[in-house]
């Protein structure tokens, strides 16, 4: 049997972990074999998952530590190899200097490469420390063995981190999917008005999901790249350690530096919990508001404007559903006194029962809406009020007005008896306003239909002494005010 064949056989019966001939070889499920001590140590250090499984150091296939099987055939081959005492490393491969054609028998410490006796005497290597190959081979053999131990530890840690990243990925997805389903279930009850809100919530969640997965995938990609570099370096070192002395020492400087300075870059903090979770109570509140609006809209009446009550500064549409101010526009109205002649009443009168109507005030910078108990005289003069507060006092329940209004483009106010005006907070500026009158309950309620029917303000527990009329005041804003038709 030739030495080449024996070397090939030796490679087949060498433990991939300790790189020595197999001792008491054990085989695992994938077919790879290892020394008994080596594979048991690997099983103890690389357990993952709830089933207590380990992964093969060669092909990473999972196996049960309890399924280790003695391989008597390999043990017999190892025994025969030990008897012939095969040691291929002692049969030196002879190579020649590419520059001088002489045998490469010397090793230059400074350059970390093999040289011939003529190279040693050249200017390039003058003053360098040179040794016979055999004198330094063991030093680098020991050095590489230590590097291999360190790099294998790094490799094991990298594999553990890969498993951890995979678990984080599954955990992340398991958080996202139930949350997505819960959001969709909650929104089913509000589908008619909440399509935009549902999409917004899902979009936010998807953005967070993509951001989290992007972080995980980046960490995974970086780890895969590092693992490949690590495997290449380990393969290079293993090839050098298993090959001839020439292969061991050829261009040793570069691989020495790579081995010494190689360090695993650990991934940055991985996401574990969603930053923001959808809260169902908010939807229940919105559902309650929606149901309240739906209830009052069941009393929707077809209100039209009464042209006999409109001032000359106002123009009504032919269908009497729209009113527009056409007088001199006031740039900075200082008080309600400047709007005294801008009102028009509805054609209907209400003395009992429940009634609802809607008004479109889109793009208007000023308006007043509600009900009044007595006809408004278009020629009424505010001269009797000597102050701005006096002008405001006209629009109070004690004077027969239950109204709210927009002033100075951004100020929403309710005109109560207790105060000249009560400032209202609007998170969403209303483009459509719903007015609900309950004569028996003595209430006038206003709803922001634009914001899914959120209540704006309610005048409550009033006694209405006479019939009430819908009240409309476009103020000095030329943008029209429009009554909406009842929806089916």
From Swiss-Prot:
Major location (coarse): cytoplasm
Enzyme class, first EC level, given as a word: transferase
Database matches in PROSITE patterns: B302_SPRY (PS50188), ZF_BBOX (PS50119), ZF_RING_1 (PS00518), ZF_RING_2 (PS50089)
Record-linked Gene3D superfamilies: 2.60.120.920, Classic Zinc Finger, Zinc/RING finger domain, C3HC4 (zinc finger)
Coiled-coil segments: 132-223
Organism superkingdom: Eukaryota
Zinc finger residue ranges, RING-type: 15-60
Gene Ontology molecular function: any one: ubiquitin protein ligase activity
BP-aspect Gene Ontology terms: antiviral innate immune response; cellular response to interferon-beta; cellular response to virus; free ubiquitin chain polymerization; negative regulation of DNA-templated transcription; negative regulation of gene expression; negative regulation of stem cell differentiation; negative regulation of viral genome replication
SUPFAM superfamilies: B-box zinc-binding domain, Concanavalin A-like lectins/glucanases, RING/U-box
Limits of the B30.2/SPRY domain: 282-488
Pfam family, one: PRY
Zinc finger (B box-type): 92-133
Annotated localization: Cytoplasm
Residues noted as binding Zn(2+) in the record, renumbered to the chain: 97, 100, 119, 125
Entry keywords, A to Z: Coiled coil, Cytoplasm, Metal-binding, Transferase, Ubl conjugation pathway, Zinc, Zinc-finger
Any one GO CC term of the record: nucleus
Job description of the protein: E3 ubiquitin ligase that plays a crucial role in the activation of the IKBKE-dependent branch of the type I interferon signaling pathway. In concert with the ubiquitin-conjugating E2 enzyme UBE2K, synthesizes unanchored 'Lys-48'-linked polyubiquitin chains that promote the oligomerization and autophosphorylation of IKBKE leading to stimulation of an antiviral response. Also ubiquitinates MYC and inhibits its transcription activation activity, maintaining the pluripotency of embryonic stem cells.
Protein name: Tripartite motif-containing protein 6
Gene: Trim6
